[in-house]
Structure formats: C-alpha cells, structure tokens
Amino acid sequence: IKKPIDFIMQKELGIEPQFLFAPLIYGAILTDRNKVGPSTIKESMKTVKKGKILGVFPEGGITSPVLTEAKPGAVFLASKTKAKILPVSVRGASNAWDNIQRGIRSRIYINIGKPYGPIKLDGTRQEKTQKINAASRELMCRIAALLPEDKHGCFSNDPSISMYQIENDLESA
C-alpha cells in the first residue's frame, strides 16, 4: 500500500505513549467507537477525497485474539464515502511491543485481500440497517478468509469464508 493511511482510532483510550508517533506518520481521526459522530464522517470523507486510505478496525478496536462482530461504522463509512473496502488481517502484533522491549523480534503477519465494493445502502431505515448488518458480516468473513481457522471466532462456521479464500487464491490462511 503506497498511499498515506489515516486511521480511525477510539478517543476514549487515547494514544498509548509508545504509539504517539503513529498519528504523525499515518494520521488519526479520533472517534467514539460506540457512536460515529458527524465530525468523524466529515473527517473520513475529507481523507478519502484527498486520495488517502482510511484505515478502520471494523470491530471497534483490537481487543480479542479471535474475530468478533463488526460495529456498523466501517460499512457505513465505506458507503458514505463510496470507497472500496480492502480487507486486511494482522496477526502476531498483540505482543510485539512487549517483545521489542525485551529484545525479542516478533513475527507479524499481514494478509491483504482483494478490494470489493463500494457498498450501496438504500431503502427504508430498516432495510439500510439490514444491509449494514449483512455487509458487516461479509467484511468480517472476508477478513476471516485471510486468517488461520482458529482465529475466525464467531464466524467459524460461515461457508462464505472458503469462497473468499478461493477469491484471494488461498486454500486456507
């Protein structure tokens, strides 16, 4: 990925001291992960209009070693900005900082799937909600396809994962 990335980060946690450099290098849009506000949407749209990549953690942060349900914000923002979604999985980063401090080099695996979208949300409010939920599930299954099976979490038995693995030229991650 050769373009600048601005990440949406949860403001309630702030930025941990060891990551203070990240917003300077990448850019950060601070948001409430439970409720996407108008300023987040405006900043996200500005980022995309500038030709930058908007990095979003669909689960609302990194809190579990396995995949969990996505919050609606990632799909909503992708729809609002008319942007394609690039599924990315990161594995092995949870202990990386601790390992670096102890002089141990961590292995971090990043898999990048094929882009898809944009997502179109139209219809009644109820229909839009259903489409957001379905698109959020699709996003998480596309990410699951890039991870080993033991990391699929609540998506473990979803048959679409194998279809996305084939789409990404993976037998299984």
Language model region names:
Residues 1-36, 43:
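Catalytic core of membrane glycerolipid acyltransferases/transacylases, capturing the structured
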Residues 39-173:
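Non-catalytic C-terminal accessory region of glycerolipid acyltransferases
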